[in-house]
């Protein structure tokens, strides 16, 4: 199945000059959603994964079913003030400025092998921050897995040394 055919592209959204890759059409198609999850699971099944981490919010959409299929837990990474327990934080760069991500302090045990699952790899800033959080908690980043990669933004360059999977690649 060609997953790219299942992703709607909306020009000039959310602003002029942006070509938005809309995953809602992919996740609305049960067969395409199953195929997406199965491809990520296949990539991870021999990596001895202990946990799946998904960044807010679309990482939850793909991360939870991957965790379920692998029989492992799912850990959310969220923006500040969204997690009720004690957290660890990392600041990460955006195109214009910085933002922060948080993880429950006790969510990852030292030495656990963790895969990050998210919808999109663009500039790499968010996933680089997530990887730092996992490592700060003592986890091992075993894989970074994306449904879509915007290759022109060169986010993969920031992820040198990590195993990276992108199911669909766009040159924007």
Curated annotation (Swiss-Prot):
Record's keyword annotation contains Glycosyltransferase: yes
Subcellular location, record wording: Cytoplasm
Molecular-function GO terms, alphabetical: adenine binding; adenine phosphoribosyltransferase activity; AMP binding
EC number, UniProt record: 2.4.2.7
Family listed: Belongs to the purine/pyrimidine phosphoribosyltransferase family.
Subunit architecture: Homodimer.
Protein name per Swiss-Prot or TrEMBL: Adenine phosphoribosyltransferase
């Amino acid at each position: 199945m060609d997953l790219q055919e299942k992703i709607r592209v909306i020009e000039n959204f959310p602003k002029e000059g942006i070509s938005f890759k809309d995953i809602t059409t992919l996740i609305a198609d049960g067969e395409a959603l199953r195929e997406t999850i199965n491809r990520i699971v296949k990539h991870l099944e021999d990596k001895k994964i202990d946990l799946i981490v998904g960044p807010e919010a679309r990482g939850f959409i793909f991360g939870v079913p991957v965790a379920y299929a692998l029989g492992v837990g799912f850990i959310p990474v969220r923006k500040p003030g969204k997690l009720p327990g004690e957290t660890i934080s990392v600041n990460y760069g955006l195109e214009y400025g910085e933002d922060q991500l948080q993880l429950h302090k006790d969510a990852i045990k030292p030495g656990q092998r963790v895969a990050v699952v998210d919808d999109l790899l663009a500039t790499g800033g968010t996933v680089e921050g997530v990887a730092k959080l996992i490592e700060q908690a003592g986890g091992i980043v075993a894989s970074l897995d994306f449904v879509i990669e915007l290759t022109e933004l060169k986010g993969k360059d920031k992820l040198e040394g990590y195993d990276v999977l992108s199911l669909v690649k766009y040159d924007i």
